[in-house]
Amino acid sequence: MRPRSALRYSLLLLALAASAAIQAQPKTLAVCTEAAPEGFDPARYTSGYTFDASAHPLYNALAAFAPGSATVIPALAESWDVSADGLVYTFRLRQGVKFHSTDYFKPTREFDADDVLFSFQRMLDPQHPAHDLSPSGYPYADAMQLRDIIERIEKIDEHQVRFVLKHPEAPFLADLAMPFGSILSAEYAGQLIARGKGDELNSKPIGTGPFVFTRYRKDAQVRYAANPDYWKGKPAIDHLVLAITLDPNVRVQRLRRNECQIALTPKPEDVAALRQDPQLTVLEEAAMITSHAAINTRHEPFDDPRVRRAIAMGFNKSSYLKIVFGDQARPAIGPYPPMLLGYDDSIRDWPYDPERAKALLKEAGVTPDTPLNLYISTGSGPGGNPARVAQLIQSDLAAIGIRVNIRQFEWGEMVKRTKAGEHDMMLYSWIGDNGDPDNFLTHNLGCASVESGENRARWCDKGFDEAIRKARMSNDESQRVALYKEAQRIFHEQMPWLPLAHPLMFDAQRKNVSGYRMSPMSARDFSRVKLD
């Protein structure tokens, strides 16, 4: 070989080696998130912030939603059959699925029917040894009255389970795809309980999902490693970091400095500028979301529907939408967004009419300067800046004689306090988890949810409750539509919420990120992400 050719050959080898070294470097995806998780057992919580850190990266359920849609597809169950009467669901479980192996748990077997039975029976059976590991109960299972839906769960063999229902339940498959249906390791839970460390099920999670939990630094970050044994294949990124960043301005700053490659829910007013940045891409989704203020109907004088209607007529919703969202939201009139089954577009919003609102308050015997304690969280989510929204409510209601006291708490603290019913009003954004109206209605407004604390309005209307119960049990779509319209009319007349907006949702990412897709249910899945 001539010297010059040898030199070229050597340089080529060096270049190839350098390229291989670069490709071999671990790829870390950092995501700036809006709030800290409350824990890592999805069955114990209802917050999307918690699910982003638990259900989506760590676990799988029997079924799932197709990326970017509400279509139910197989997950840990590779297929299922439903009996003609809608009462028996038989699931064939996926084989060869491994639970995470960590420094605190080494599984000795693969996922099987015992894990399905454990994951559901702990919620359903008060005598189950794992039931009391969640001191506040299982909010979704309780609010959905899962015990009144499921007659029994049977293990047919290692790879088949059967759910027998007490009555038909239209959204049952979609319900099972929700985060509360995440499948945990019965083997791991049994070891923890035997050692008297059952609480670690919520702090040292083990699942079958795309990422393995490595560390949580409270209120700062959650770290994960790619699951090398993931049944769908190892994720393209090696490490995932959820960087808890309450301030949306700081989330954007960190994104621009490449400290985060994805920033969740930037402020709507920042979206236009973000779209002009050549290093960034803005993703947009018409999510299933209703931002609202739940009014505690157990507190006087807000137990009177006239007072709640007065609040609706005293609030300038058009001004609020313009100030908080620009043109990035539509007004909310009812409890769920227009894209869902049975939405009644014939219902008209209560008009902005401060004088009529004052007259209603006077008719209800409400004296001027009546206090209202409005609970809000720190940070900013899809419903906009809570403090700014609260100030607008405060200003408008002052004009009709209601003095709003704003009380702001960290997210988890606000959830705890409002679940206990301390508030007169609470700002909240509910994002649908399964693409069905029932997810908005039964969980947030059903009578059973009053006792569990998930119904922040503490409102129980028997006519409303009966309508949504019948709709949930019917497989006749036209009947469901009629029942949901009946429920919406009752809601509109009673006004347990001040419905605010159905906002668009936004996430921002750097140009070198691909494979991330938003979901109408706001489920964040980072398992398909690639970093170029």
From Swiss-Prot:
Its primary localisation, in coarse terms, equals periplasm
Q: Check the record and name the Pfam families matching this protein.
A: SBP_bac_5 (PF00496)
What biological process terms from GO does the record include? dipeptide transport; protein transport
From the Swiss-Prot or TrEMBL record, what is one GO molecular function term? peptide transmembrane transporter activity
The signal peptide stretch is: 1-24
This protein's GO cellular component annotations are:
ATP-binding cassette (ABC) transporter complex; outer membrane-bounded periplasmic space
Matches recorded under CDD domains: PBP2_DppA_like (cd08493)
Ordered alphabetically, the record's keywords are:
Peptide transport, Periplasm, Protein transport, Signal, Transport
Residues passing through the membrane, by range:
none
Localization, UniProt: Periplasm
Q: Does the keyword Signal apply?
A: yes
Q: Does the keyword Transport apply?
A: yes
**SUPFAM superfamilies named in the record:** Periplasmic binding protein-like II
Q: Which family does it belong to?
A: Belongs to the bacterial solute-binding protein 5 family.
Role noted for this protein: Binds different tripeptides. Probably recognizes specifically tripeptides composed exclusively of L-amino acids.
How is this protein named in the record? Answer: Tripeptide-binding protein
Q: Which organism is it from?
A: Pseudomonas aeruginosa (strain ATCC 15692 / DSM 22644 / CIP 104116 / JCM 14847 / LMG 12228 / 1C / PRS 101 / PAO1)
